[in-house]
């Protein structure tokens, strides 16, 4: 069954002024759509491949485009219109299991965000910053993946796209400004839902 581009759970301009409508339209309709199209093409080619060599040759396309589709599908749900703008619940972390786990690990939400942003900004080239649940220890950890690699070692709770297409048209080369702004539109309610689901 072919993969399809998921609808955004909000309008393209809903995350302004923190993420512009132009970025959201390009990111969703062009970049994510390309990952979906390329993943479908790679899977079709894999199904027709008749030799191990042909199947091996398709592995990188499957990983890259499959990861791009998985990561972005999670990313859109990870965002919400900003509460500070009176538009939604973005940026609002209420008392509950997620806030408690963050405070237990990092002392405060501010400390967590500082460490997350520093770790994510240090990625060389393109990639993703993650807050993930370590399935072995049941603890939250900050980690990164390169390019479009999906997070396989942890259960993803929050993912932040640090590819230039996610921020360059608005923030140019200043990753720090993008990383500061994105927390104002992070959907902590969705992140907490993932955490609760992962710890059942």
UniProtKB/Swiss-Prot annotation:
The keyword Secreted does not apply. Binds 1 Mn(2+) ion per subunit. Its main location: mitochondrion. It catalyses: 2 superoxide + 2 H(+) = H2O2 + O2. The keyword Metal-binding applies. Keywords: Antioxidant, Manganese, Metal-binding, Mitochondrion, Oxidoreductase, Transit peptide. GO terms for molecular function: manganese ion binding; superoxide dismutase activity. Its EC number is 1.15.1.1. This is Superoxide dismutase [Mn], mitochondrial. It comes from Ganoderma microsporum.
